[in-house]
């Protein structure tokens, strides 16, 4: 996705050698047209998978996930980082470590919204070490459902996330792959 690659190059802010801040279009302020285009792209990549549900984790994955769900015509479900008082039925739960925030959250999904009949496409904003997607995949398995793929908006390919997801048997598609953040500069795969 050339528009996304351009945004990452022009608007991404490098913080150290492992963190890329994309608040201007994805993680704080959202570029709606770009999210729509992301939805279309993931739809084209996974349209033959008979997807019944899109799954992400709150909060930054929600914007692209909603657009993907819109294109598929299926619900978008997000794992919550806290159990609300309104959740009085059963739920699936797992721990997910956030690379960016260096914090582990216990995330939950109501049993009401995910079951063994679902074919789930996981969507996330970033792929670093793969903890978020692996955690979401654990929730899918708890429900007896099937993960048909993982769609990543921005992958930091210099980290181990893709390898870990593929070792878990997951099909991974990334729209923008960052090769390096060295020298306070974003270098995309293919530019090295």
Swiss-Prot record:
Q: Read off the InterPro entries from this record.
A: PRibTrfase_dom, PRTase-like, Pur/Pyrimidine_PRTase, Xanthine_PRibTrfase
| Residues where 5-phospho-alpha-D-ribose 1-diphosphate binds | 128-132
A single GO BP: XMP salvage
Main site of residence? cytoplasm
User: Kind of enzyme, top EC level?
Assistant: transferase
Cite the GO molecular-function annotations of the record: xanthine phosphoribosyltransferase activity
User: Could you tell me what reaction this enzyme catalyses?
Assistant: XMP + diphosphate = xanthine + 5-phospho-alpha-D-ribose 1-diphosphate
Annotated residues that bind xanthine are located at 20, 27, 156
The record describes the protein's role as:
Converts the preformed base xanthine, a product of nucleic acid breakdown, to xanthosine 5'-monophosphate (XMP), so it can be reused for RNA or DNA synthesis.
Question: Which NCBIfam families does the UniProt entry name for this protein?
Answer: PRK09219.1, XPRTase
- Subunit organization: Homodimer.
Its protein name is: Xanthine phosphoribosyltransferase
